[in-house]
Amino acid sequence: DEFLELRTFESFPGLRRVLHDFIDCIALSPNKFVLTSRYVVRTLRLLRDRSARFEVVHLPGLTVEDTLDIVGMSAASDAADAEHTARSVQALADGRPAYVRALADELGTMREHGGGDPVSALAALLAPDGRLAKLCGFCYELRLHRARGYGALKAILEILGEEEGLTLTEISQRLRRTPGSTKDYLSWLEDVDLVTARQKRYSFSDPLLRVWVRLHCRPTAPSDDDLAREVHRYALPRLPQQEPALVMAVAGSSGIIE
């Protein structure tokens, strides 16, 4: 598990190529191994020119059917409602297993106390002491500390938190750095899977992490109005067609949505 952490030993004399030596060794072994890592880009780069014995298997996001198995029929009044809830949870969680599980557990807790819906569950989970707020914070810090240039990378993520789909030039202007140094920073963010580039425009790899950055990478803790506004902005384009009323209901209970 997390085999790339062997890089920790590279700071010791004689172990500067420990990760490459490890890969070369297991490539020659008659045994079979299963290696895992959360760092997709780094793994692909390491194995790119290695033995054909290595097969990279990407873990796909959860489907609606997978999500329904986790959420369970008990979370709804009938089969149609259960499927709709599963679709909403899967969309809000971007199919990510940890997020789906957190939403499913929060929905279960809410319904034990009289009701709840996926949007209000997401808002509760992103509150300062919420489960998803803590999980996103952990992933954010873990990945940043595995990259170089912590301060500059954090500034870029806050820029993309405000507006996604920016070009290298636009980011460098807002960062007030040269395009060359900004390109290096962006490559380091891509290296730990925090951002992706499509048609030379940069965005968060994890859309829910962007919501967390907007809410929690600021001088003060988010208010209920802040939570309602950001969850509304995130959820509205992702929910099934008939779901926006839920978003407005949650927004109305927590604050005014502009």
Model-derived features with residue positions:
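Accessory beta->alpha helical hairpin/"wing" motif in late/C-terminal subdomains of nucleic-acid enzymes
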Residues: 198-211
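A short, conserved structural fragment
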Residues: 190-200
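Winged-helix-like regulatory helical subdomains adjacent to P-loop NTPase cores
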Residues: 101-179, 226-232
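Exposed, interaction-prone assembly regions rather than primary DNA-binding/catalytic cores
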Residues: 57, 233-258
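Short amphipathic alpha-helical interaction segments
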Residues: 175-191
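Short, amphipathic alpha-helical interaction segments positioned at domain boundaries
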Residues: 208-239
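Conserved small helical "lid"/interfacial subdomain of P-loop NTPases
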Residues: 57-85, 91-92, 103
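Conserved Walker B catalytic segment
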Residues: 1-40, 45-49
